[in-house]
Amino acid sequence: MWKEINEQSKILFNNCFNKKLIVTCAESCTGGMLASSIVSISGSSAIFKSSVVTYSNDMKSKILNIPLKLINENGAVSKIIAYNMASNVLNLMSADISIAVTGIAGPS
């Protein structure tokens, strides 16, 4: 997964740099891997604003203002929660683009 994240981060960096766009992230199961990959690119401060890691449902609610009822009804690993993570971090950080990652970090 790390290799793919790094490859996609380079593409993201080039696109955002050329268009002068600022990006922010909300991550769950990746635990900051996406943000780490982006900031490892030379010049990333030109495009990267911030990131939040909301691993638990409680933090998704407290930091990203996603109602626990919505999480409980749909599951943390759902399209609507990913959408809310992206939308709410975009508003929170006043960036141009946001990326959200949610999933299951299980043993398999």
What are these regions (language model features)?
Residues M1-S108:
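Short alpha-helical segments enriched in small residues
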